[in-house]
């Protein structure tokens, strides 16, 4: 008798995988195990909850029971997996164990919190659970410090500013989105945030946080300090690899998988934010959707290597939205930038004259798909 497929996790990657499996096989036993409630919500919405006055419960799209019934699966919410015996094909919690034929790790990623004095005062917004734990504090806060000027930090800074809060955005780098694009490209967003009233502290490093009668004192390495009501860490995500390590599966930055989404153990796979696919961590929706399509085939006996096309990444900053694609982080590209009142097109060209990356904003975003077709990958 088939022991079926076990998926650890209940986020976007896990749900996409379930849907793709059920498109091909209505009967293979499916089991979902996760530490949270398993209710569905749209994680990107967390970047806009404050300006839209949304509570954590407002984000719920589908209850876990409805999903389980719709897709014919067993579910074990609020369950912490303690160990995986890869040789015996057994997943263990403190009081239960499950046997599997194939196991999928969809354990996601956790928000990195800088290891500074007072780090316990920092909030993170990487899940509905995390938002639920701090929504009252964030709603009441008037002065907000966001640590990290990447995608999430920039999105949150705009959202809190649109909600009428006093926002300070801090980053070690000299420009926003520094790991994604050069400053001459990100400067349009940077200037817009400043015009909105966001106070930028670039080339700045946080040293410590202290609770005071007035709120929280944030002290920089430079000894400059500011008083705020809330501090949010937006300093990146770390793939959740602890279970994979305990199972004896190869791990680097994420859980190492090949083009078949297979780990170093032939019956264990990984997908989503926890996975490192041929050396790349790709925590974006489109690669996860494609991964789910291919992995479903492979779990059901197929042999389909994942092929990822050039893909758009969307920066969800509504007053100055951006789309980017290609190797925008490459330092050897020559950037050709056309900036007008209705938007910007920035093209990253190689020494051979090939289009290797681009960033478009505002009304020029409609040109993104045409540019994608000419992108060299």
Curated annotation (Swiss-Prot):
Gene3D superfamilies: 3.30.390.120, FAD/NAD(P)-binding domain (3.50.50.60). InterPro entries: FAD-bd_OxRdtase (IPR050260), FAD/NAD-bd_sf (IPR036188), FAD/NAD-binding_dom (IPR023753), NO_rdtase_NorW (IPR023961), Rbx-bd (IPR041364). Pathway: Nitrogen metabolism; nitric oxide reduction. PANTHER family: NITRITE REDUCTASE [NAD(P)H], PYRIDINE NUCLEOTIDE-DISULFIDE OXIDOREDUCTASE DOMAIN-CONTAINING. NCBIfam families: PRK04965.1. This is Nitric oxide reductase FlRd-NAD(+) reductase. It is an enzyme of class 1 (oxidoreductase). The lineage of its organism: Bacteria, Pseudomonadati, Pseudomonadota, Gammaproteobacteria, Enterobacterales.
